[in-house]
Amino acid sequence: MGKETPAEKSLNLIRGRLCDPSYVFRPLSASSDSNYSKLKFIVSTSITEGCNNSMLLLGPRGSGKAAVLDLGVGDLLEQFPDSVSVIRLNGLLHSDDNCAFKEIAKQLCMEHHLLFSKMASFDDNSQFIIAMLRACGLAHKTIIFVLDEFDMFAQGKQRLLYSLLDAMQSVTSQAVVVGISSRLDADQLLEKRVRSRFSHRKFLFLPPSREELDGLFVHLLSLPADSGFPSGYVSRFNDKIKNLTSDTRFKDILKTLFNANSTVNSFLKFIFCAVSLMNLESGLLSLENFKAALSSMQRQPKLEAVRDCSVLELYLLVCMRRLEVKEQSSYNFISVMKEYKAIHDSFHTSDYYAQNVCLRAFEHLRERQVICYAENRGQSQTGEYRLQKLLISASELHQGMRSHACCPAILLKLLDH
């Protein structure tokens, strides 16, 4: 393999940054008022002062709850390497109490180099966990229980939550329970006996501000001056990034992106797409890269459905649209076939199919939810007599047909007139 060019090297560097949560969330966590700072302070207090704590991290998926927690726990593990033990559960995997207790016992055994018994009963595992909490407390070691998909644990009898929180009432225990959930009402799901033992400390993960986004954008994409890149290339690359942040067209792209999804995770995917489209000859990111990235992020299933239609199905869709233009808001297969025959008779098109073939294409459109029944009445009627309606707008149909690989030119003409 040949030597990497500066463009290839910068591409690999930025991709590595985007895949490293600690690098991504470090600048967002710099403020003393950030969730990272508050969370780290509470957990470090539990470690240094030997007290128990519980908290919830709430926010939409992709907002960085788990990443910020991992960042804080990672820093504490470096600061107190022999005083912290982390147990991780996921509600999608361990919502069953028996399974959850067994998993906790297994992770505790691995952490403390003990033998784990697969045959241990629920009571055995429960007693073992309580004994380990007591022993770790006496040894001034804090156990951090991370419960991802916390709302899944807040269903049923909630024995796991009750047992953990009840054991933390003991003077000798030293533990922190951190719940992570995308449900903002997760604490309201708790039973009264569990809620009374929970601290009700909640951290909300809100979308980043515009200033934070600009700072994150520069942080992720700027090249360091002392990284082995040619100095001229670094200055050109970084100047291009700064110019983009002040470009109104780029701001409009970001606005469109965040109207659909305002999470950090969505922003990272957007940047990753743009970086992957970078021209390796120039080695610089352009506005066009970000426009293309936005297009790839904006899934348009209706347009995709039109692009995947057969030519016959396109004819049927155009017929239905023409009937709507004629102020015929609802129609059945029979009236669509009359319009289809009228088009064939007027323009002598070669794409003319038998009625039974057209009916199968019509049913296929309904199966793909491009069209649907106009009303629930008339269920006793056969499919070709029931009223139908289009589920796509005229602009979506036109756009989908223009990007269709085999769309006959006559259909676009018929759609416009």
Swiss-Prot record:
GO terms for cellular component: nuclear origin of replication recognition complex. SUPFAM superfamilies: P-loop containing nucleoside triphosphate hydrolases. It comes from the Eukaryota. ATP binds at G59, P60, R61, G62, S63, G64, K65, A66. The keyword Nucleus applies. GO terms for molecular function: ATP binding; ATP hydrolysis activity; DNA replication origin binding. It is found in: Nucleus. Follow a cell-cycle regulation with a peak at the G1/S-phase. Isoform AtORC4a is expressed at low levels ubiquitously. Isoform AtORC4b is mostly expressed in siliques, flowers and flower buds, and, to a lower exent, in roots, leaves and stems. InterPro entries: ATPase_AAA_core (IPR003959), ORC4 (IPR016527), ORC4_C (IPR032705), P-loop_NTPase (IPR027417). Signal peptide: none annotated. Keywords: ATP-binding, DNA replication, DNA-binding, Nucleotide-binding, Nucleus. One of its GO terms (biological process) is DNA replication initiation. Induction: Regulated by E2F. Accumulates rapidly after cell cycle reactivation by sucrose addition following cell cycle arrest mediated by sucrose deprivation. Its main location: nucleus. Component of the origin recognition complex (ORC) that binds origins of replication. DNA-binding is ATP-dependent. The specific DNA sequences that define origins of replication have not been identified yet. ORC is required to assemble the pre-replication complex necessary to initiate DNA replication. Component of the origin recognition complex (ORC) composed of at least ORC1 (ORC1A or ORC1B), ORC2, ORC3, ORC4, ORC5 and ORC6. ORC is regulated in a cell-cycle and development dependent manner. It is sequentially assembled at the exit from anaphase of mitosis and disassembled as cells enter S phase. Interacts directly with ORC1A, ORC2, ORC3, ORC5 and ORC6. Belongs to the ORC4 family. This is Origin of replication complex subunit 4. It comes from Arabidopsis thaliana.
